[in-house]
Regions:
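Active-site neighborhood of phospho(di)ester-bond hydrolases with catalytic His/Asp-centered motifs
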Residues: 165-166, 189-190, 212-216
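Active-site mouth of glycoside hydrolases
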Residues: 24-28, 32-185, 198, 206-208, ...
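Solvent-exposed segments in extracellular or luminal domains encompassing
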Residues: 374-378
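Active-site metal-binding loops of divalent metal-dependent hydrolases
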Residues: 134, 192, 217
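Bacterial Sec-dependent N-terminal signal peptides
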Residues: 1-21
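Active-site phosphate/pyrophosphate- and oxyanion-stabilizing loops and adjacent acidic/basic residues
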Residues: 152, 201, 250
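Substrate-binding cleft/loops of secretory-pathway carbohydrate-active enzymes
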Residues: 169-200, 224-226, 269-276
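Substrate-binding clefts and catalytic carboxylate motifs of secreted carbohydrate-active enzymes
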Residues: 27-28, 35, 39, 44, ...
Length: 378
């Protein structure tokens, strides 16, 4: 019996470690991603928390930016029937990395070789994400040679998974560099927000003739939004964001599925970036926000029976955010919000939690870690 159990354990371990094969296939009208020989359109989210909820909304894949928790994320994804775009965090010039320093570049490549060797046979692995926004505020195009060396190692040692690299938005210069210097990149990936509508037309125009993915997308970025007269960007409310998620997916992602292999919505989790609510699909207390309803609708194709309330109006002192609200600190002012429930939905009581938070003084770029702004109490 003991011998039989040992053999069975070895068999299960072997089965678990067999890689699923992902391929990019040229079709009569574009490209298709296939997993184990079957079409696989990526309906993904950027982030790896609440995987049961990811499955519940009809998503099929998660994206990471680095490998700090790779084993845990891959294993949990496998248990939940999800795949993983595993990010290899290639160092940024803007953080001090010198791509003219061959010793440092070689050490980085050697590290990623060990990572690739370790995880290449995991059954939840879908795609290798070789670098994220290495083009942001950079001056040295040698970074693309480093991207190519990593991607080539993937192709040399892992026949089962394609490679992608991710740029901050889409422009002709980076498309030209990747086309010329990175022949082992299979898929071009773009992080894009308000400019997402230009991607389908621009990507071929800029010289990339292969497939692409949208690896971050969501509301308008804080750099793309209207500002107050004192220069602070105005965040969309959750209802406005829900409409944006729905329309951008339907019009610019799904509609171009002959060349766009899918997407990863940003951000599945909570994050302080300009504000604590701008990009996160969950509050810092892990409460889901209204845009998740939009993702469930587009991923499943079904209308929700119990969606979140719609915000009709939100005002302070009878003014909305775009009115450049100025209030005296010693005054007392009314704040009002009007919501609407979907048909056949009723609630006995709505709870409102009002918070006043100072404007952030730790605003950075590229998603770098920011300190939370101070909440005003009393």
């Amino acid at each position: 019996m003991t011998k039989q159990l040992i053999i069975l354990s070895l068999f299960l371990l072997t089965v678990f470690s067999v890689a699923a094969q992902t391929k990019v296939v040229k079709t009569s009208n574009g490209f298709e991603l296939q997993r184990n020989g079957k079409p696989y359109y990526i309906k993904g989210v950027g982030g790896d928390v609440n995987m049961e909820k990811i499955v519940a909304i009809g998503a099929n894949s998660v994206r990471t930016w680095g490998v700090e928790r790779a084993q845990e994320v891959l294993d949990e994804a496998q248990r939940n029937g999800l795949t993983v775009m595993l990010g290899l965090w290639v160092q940024h010039e803007r953080h001090g990395f010198d791509y003219n320093n061959q010793d440092k570049v070689a050490k980085q490549l050697a590290y990623f070789k060990t990572v690739i060797d370790r995880f290449k046979n995991h059954p939840a692995l879908l795609i290798w994400g070789v670098g994220n926004e290495v083009d942001l505020n950079y001056t040295n195009p040698n970074v693309w040679n480093a991207i190519q060396d990593i991607a080539k190692y993937v192709h040399d040692t892992d026949p089962n998974h394609p490679t992608t690299t991710v740029t901050a938005g889409l422009d002709s210069l980076e498309a030209a560099f990747i086309t010329a210097r990175c022949p082992d990149i299979d898929i071009y990936s773009i992080n894009t927000y308000g400019d997402i509508g230009n991607v389908p037309n621009h990507i071929a125009k800029f010289g990339w003739n292969g497939p692409y993915m949208i690896t971050e997308w969501g509301p308008n970025g804080h750099w793309e939004s209207p500002q107050t007269k004192w220069g602070v960007s105005i965040e969309q409310n959750s209802t406005e964001k829900k409409e944006v998620y729905f329309n951008r997916y339907k019009n610019y992602i799904e509609k171009n599925s002959n060349t766009c292999l899918g997407s990863y919505a940003f951000l599945w989790g909570a994050k302080q970036e300009y504000t604590e609510t701008w990009y996160g699909l969950f509050s810092k207390n892990n409460i889901p926000t209204e845009p998740i309803d939009a993702l469930e609708e587009v991923f499943t194709g079904n209308a929700l029976t119990n969606p979140a309330p719609t915000i009709l109006n939100f005002q302070v002192d009878q003014q909305k955010a775009t009115d450049n609200i100025e209030l005296k600190s010693s005054g007392i002012f009314d704040a009002n919000i009007n919501i609407q429930l979907a048909e056949n939905v009723s609630i006995e009581k709505a709870n409102y939690n009002w918070r006043i938070i100072e404007e952030s003084t730790d605003k950075k770029s590229g998603g770098d870690v920011e300190d939370a702004a101070t909440e005003i109490t009393g």
